[in-house]
Design a protein with these regions (language model features):
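Outer-membrane beta-barrel "beta-signal"
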Residues: 333, 390, 522-536
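Outer-membrane beta-barrel signature, preferentially recognizing the C-terminal barrel domain
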Residues: 207, 322-323, 340-342, 352-406, ...
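Gram-negative outer-membrane beta-barrel transporters
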Residues: 399-474
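N-terminal periplasmic accessory domains that precede
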Residues: 49-52, 86, 111-134, 146
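Surface-exposed extracellular loop regions of Gram-negative outer-membrane beta-barrel proteins
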Residues: 122-134, 174, 180-188, 193-195, ...
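Short acidic/polar hinge/loop motifs at secondary-structure boundaries
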Residues: 80-104
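Flexible loop and strand-edge segments within Gram-negative outer membrane beta-barrel domains
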Residues: 168-247, 270-272, 281, 353, ...
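Transmembrane beta-strands of outer-membrane beta-barrel pores
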Residues: 135-140, 154, 165-169, 193-199, ...
Length: 536
């Protein structure tokens, strides 16, 4: 009797973390971003970053090589100048602590216009692991791809390294190194280095970037200071530029535990030179930003503002032109959380379009309405006012998200954007899990000039003997920019994977498959991608 009681009691103790983990939401809405926690999902271990991103309502798949064309990919808020398609398909969800889908981070991150950020925070293993992978893409054009990836974690040091090479009408080389050093419980240093080299028939370009992020925690209440320093050099056949930057940011509770404040200053100094004319220009940006969040058990209120000071100078034939402008981003948001499953958001966001410096200083012919900036001789902003309503329901095996936004654009066309997504998984929990994942979503864009939509469906089956079969299908209605660009109304990709023991994985993707059967396709991109991966 006592023995049975002890066994039952031990089982309950071991089960508590599992119950607590499954009770936490997979998706968490914040004022300026949506957080996804893969570790709270039921994972087989083979899910990729791209699989998890299927639950994002505003995800726009533009093709096999451009699945997140409207996002800037970062790791720990450092831009990742790598082969995006490889990173999305190779990075495993089990190695990710959280995904930050940042659609309105104009205050916190200084994004401009409709710019969005996809920020990944890694979950490091307690030992060294990684893989070496080779790929061949066989279609109208043949491509060879090689990649190596390594993760290492310990009590004091974490290391992430990724390198890839692609040969297809030229050569592309990428290298990313990211290291975290924890000196003690209150001091941490993140260092980051990335390099890319692109050798194409049109010319050669390269980019090198280094960044250091130092965190110091002052007290047990969580008052934290962040200091960032970085430098970037980029060069292509037309231009070369240097970009040093700095950030100083303080995050702290204020007066009560419910009220928190983010206060920061940020600056960068871009120095650009036009090679054929020897014309050069300097752009100095200095920002001040402040954001308050008041959190109650079921309510969160956030207000914030970032003021940007622009100083830019053109130097040409001994003549110097100087200009100065001020911009600001703002947000105001309320989030209601009635229980651990449901979340509702209502927010207002003020952002702006800033015409690029290139047409302003180079007198370049552009494909957008930024041409008008040339005649004015200075940057003139266009304000964007966005109202957003969002809802999320999430638990371990099911997430549902909906979003509705209205954009009022100064001197532009106002439009409405609607998005919805569903992610559902049913698994048989064994040593070799089998089951099914169903993911889908839709996006609708409507304005006076027209309306278009996209619908996507992405099922994945986990079969016995470690087989995995997945499919991505996206349908684009008339007037969709994607459909008008390619001439094809449907994008499709069929994937088959087979795991051989713990070390080897063989996969085949038949991508852009509908290009082969649609006569209106402007470019036939359908191909078979074959890859072999060795894990260590």
């Amino acid at each position: 009797m006592n023995r049975h009681f002890l066994i039952l009691f031990s089982f309950l103790l071991l089960s508590v973390p599992t119950f607590a983990e499954s009770a936490l939401p997979v998706v968490e809405i914040k004022a300026d971003r949506t957080m996804i926690y893969p570790q709270r999902m039921e994972l087989t271990g083979e899910e990729t970053l791209m699989d998890v991103l299927q639950m994002v309502p505003e995800l726009m798949i533009a093709g096999y090589e451009d699945v997140i064309d409207n996002y800037n990919l970062r790791i720990d808020n450092c831009p990742m100048n790598g082969d995006t398609r490889l990173i999305l398909s190779q990075m495993k969800a089990k190695d990710i602590a959280k995904i930050q889908v940042c659609d309105n981070t104009g205050v916190a991150k200084g994004t401009i216009g409709m710019g969005r950020v996809l920020d990944i925070n890694m979950k490091m293993p307690e030992r060294l692991n990684g893989f070496v992978e080779g790929q061949g893409d066989f279609g109208k054009e043949v491509a060879g791809i090689g990649a190596v990836n390594a993760l290492y974690g310990s009590k004091a040091t974490d290391l992430y390294a990724n390198a890839s090479y692609r040969h297809q009408n030229g050569n592309e080389e990428y290298l990313t190194l990211h290291m975290t050093n924890r000196f003690d419980e209150r001091n941490k240093l993140l260092t980051y280095f990335t390099q890319q080299y692109l050798d194409h028939p049109a010319g050669t370009s390269r980019k090198v970037m280094g960044r250091a992020r130092y965190f110091h925690t002052f007290n047990d209440q969580g008052t934290e200071l962040l200091i960032v320093g970085g430098y970037q050099y980029a060069s292509d056949p037309a231009l070369s530029n240097k970009l040093p930057l700095y950030i100083v940011e303080l995050n702290t509770p204020l007066l009560t535990k419910q009220l928190s404040m983010m206060l920061g200053v940020e600056g960068d100094f871009q120095m650009t030179k036009q090679k054929d004319t020897d014309r050069s220009w300097d752009v100095f940006n200095n920002d001040i930003y402040l954001q308050f969040t008041y959190a109650l058990p079921q309510w969160k209120l956030t207000v914030g503002n970032r003021v940007m000071f622009y100083n830019y100078k053109l130097m040409d034939a001994g003549i110097s032109q100087k200009h100065a402008d001020t911009r600001d981003n703002a947000n105001a948001c309320v989030i209601y959380v009635p229980d651990s499953r449901n979340q509702i958001q209502l927010g207002y966001y003020r952002k702006y379009y800033n015409p690029s410096y290139q047409p302003l200083f180079m007198n370049a012919i552009t494909l957008s309405d930024e041409e008008w900036a040339i005649t004015k001789g200075q940057l003139v902003e266009r304000t964007i006012n966005q109202m957003k309503l969002a809802y999320a329901y999430s638990k371990q095996r099911l997430t549902v998200q909906t979003e509705a936004s209205y954009y009022a654009i100064e001197d532009g066309e106002n439009f409405t954007e609607l998005g919805a997504s569903v992610y559902w998984k049913t698994m048989v929990s064994t040593n070799r899990p089998t089951g099914l994942t169903l993911a889908g979503g839709s996006n609708l864009y409507t304005a006076k000039s027209g309306t278009y939509a996209s619908f996507r469906f992405a099922p994945t089956a986990y079969l016995p003997h470690e087989w995995q079969i997945g499919m991505q299908v996206v349908y684009y209605t008339r007037n969709s920019p994607r459909r008008e660009t390619t001439g094809v109304p449907v994008y499709g990709c069929l994937s088959v994977n087979k795991q051989f023991g713990k070390k080897w994985n063989l996969g085949v993707d038949w991508h852009d498959m509908f290009d082969a059967i649609r006569s209106e396709a402007k470019v036939n991109r359908h191909a078979a991608n074959i890859r072999l991966q060795y894990r260590f």
